[in-house]
Amino acid sequence: MIYVDQAPLQNYLSDWGPESGNRGMNNPQALEGLQRTLETDPKTAHLGTIAACLGYRSHPRPGDPTEGSKEWQEDEAFFLKEALKGDGWWYGKLMADHTALDWRDAIKHSFGSGSGSTTKTLVVASTRSGCFPSAGPLKVVDLANGGTEGGHARGVAVEWGGHWCYWEKPEKFNELVLEFLSE
């Protein structure tokens, strides 16, 4: 199993806050605002998603693509075209489901110590994600390994991309995945 920059919970709760949860989509008010924007101004909503999901936009570094560059423009055109094919109301419902679900117990019971699972798990987090601090996705490793080292799950925090690191650096991502699959 491979998780890519996805924390087991997006919303903030008393035991889960900004150190692990989603940077922006983490409470009912944020969800309501996104849903409204998806219905009334979908282009703006999708441009916000693109900005958060591409590391070179959310956490730019020297040498990264810049606004106006070919890569910036092509990525934006591609993702915006694809996103605008969908219905904003349905995207809003999907995000309501996506943000509210808390997978921590399900991961612990399905893959953790005592579950009997031997499923190998790779968690790819990003230090440049506009969606999650890397600690959120990496919590999956702790849950699957029961808080001990040497379990079936391992995690890595990459610096070469954001939430969509597989898009930004597909060769590096594929190398990471192929190495994991060959273990």
Question: Which residues are covered by each model-predicted region?
Answer:
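Low-complexity, intrinsically disordered short segments enriched for Gly/Pro and polybasic residues
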Residues: 7-10, 26-33, 78, 100, ...
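Active-site-proximal flexible loops/turns
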Residues: 12, 16, 94, 166-170
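Conserved loop-alpha-helix segment in the C-terminal half of the alpha/beta-hydrolase fold
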Residues: 110-162, 167, 172-174
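Short, flexible/disordered intra-domain loops and linkers
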Residues: 14-21, 64-66, 131-139
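Flexible "cap/lid" loop of the alpha/beta hydrolase fold
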Residues: 1-42
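C-terminal alpha-helix
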Residues: 176-183
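Alpha/beta-hydrolase
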Residues: 22, 37-129
